[in-house]
Curated annotation (Swiss-Prot):
It comes from Aromatoleum aromaticum (strain DSM 19018 / LMG 30748 / EbN1). It holds the Pfam family ATP-synt_B. This is ATP synthase subunit b. Keywords: ATP synthesis, Cell inner membrane, Cell membrane, CF(0), Hydrogen ion transport, Ion transport, Membrane, Transmembrane, Transmembrane helix, Transport. It is a single-pass membrane protein. GO terms for molecular function: proton-transporting ATP synthase activity, rotational mechanism; proton-transporting ATPase activity, rotational mechanism. The keyword Translocase does not apply.
Length: 157
């Protein structure tokens, strides 16, 4: 019976130990496990939220980059258009200045040609008068008259 009494005593001690454990030890352990499980769940939820926020931020960045590229393309096209307009205006201004200079040069050349013609007319008239004077001063002789006309001809050339 010693064995039975020992067994019963061990059973009583075991149940007392189990009861003390269930009453005083088990609740803090369960509480700590529940808190740890809650922290893990909160951490996973925060990680999922952060992942979703990261995905949303990446989409926003992609959209902003696309908008920036489009804006840069528009700015570039506008700058090219302004440069082309500036070049066209400069070419038109240069063509106008060249045409104006050409007209002025042609007018000047025309005026110079007119002055040269008038000077030539004056010289021809003077030579004709001088030739007529020489002819009239000398006797009218066919040979002398022909020589004078030949001299006049060479002077005019």
């Amino acid at each position: 019976m010693n064995l039975n009494a020992t067994l019963i005593a061990q059973l009583v001690v075991f149940f007392i130990l189990a009861w003390v454990t269930m009453k005083f030890v088990w609740p803090p352990i369960v509480k700590a496990l529940d808190e740890r499980a809650k922290k893990i769940a909160d951490g996973l939820a925060a990680a999922d939220k952060a992942k979703a926020d990261l995905s949303l931020a990446e989409k926003k960045v992609v959209d902003e980059l696309r908008k920036a590229r489009e804006s840069a393309g528009d700015v570039r096209a506008s700058a090219e258009k302004q440069a082309a307009k500036f070049l066209d205006d400069a070419r038109a201004e240069a063509a106008r200045i060249i045409a104006q200079a050409r007209e002025a040069a042609e007018a000047e050349a025309g005026t110079a040609a007119q002055r040269a013609k008038e000077a030539l007319r004056d010289q021809v008239a003077h030579l004709a008068v001088a030739g007529a004077e020489k002819i009239l001063r000398r006797e009218i002789n066919a040979q002398v008259h022909a020589d004078l006309l030949a001299n006049l001809k060479t002077e005019l050339q």
